[in-house]
Amino acid sequence: MRHQLRIPLLSKPADQRKALLRGLTTQLIREGRVTTTKARAKALRNEAERMISLAKEGSLASRRRAIGYIYDKKLVHSLFEKAKERYGDRNGGYTRIVRTVSRKGDNAQMAIIELV
């Protein structure tokens, strides 16, 4: 049964879903914005905000957790350097989801997720 399922399944097995979200999180932190489907953007928001919260905390343990999740090690170090000054006064809500036009091929709802 599907009662109280906290994460969206995204029609993928667990390993593929985790790899997809890791890749999207890495790309979002690198580029600042990602265009994807609305369901993926909503799932990505949780992971990206978790990584930014770890970066704001700044401890060695949180840095190691972020290195274990984000694919690019240099990107993690730059995130930890910039997160406190960029998001220091903000308690969550580090991302914004903006809906865009539907995808032409399958009419999927698309969205742009960007860092605030």
Swiss-Prot record:
The keyword Transcription regulation does not apply. GO terms for cellular component: cytosolic large ribosomal subunit. GO terms for molecular function: structural constituent of ribosome. It holds the Pfam family Ribosomal_L17. InterPro entries: Ribosomal_bL17, Ribosomal_bL17_sf. GO terms for biological process: translation. Keywords: Ribonucleoprotein, Ribosomal protein. Belongs to the bacterial ribosomal protein bL17 family. HAMAP family: Ribosomal_bL17. Part of the 50S ribosomal subunit. Contacts protein L32. This is Large ribosomal subunit protein bL17. The gene is rplQ.
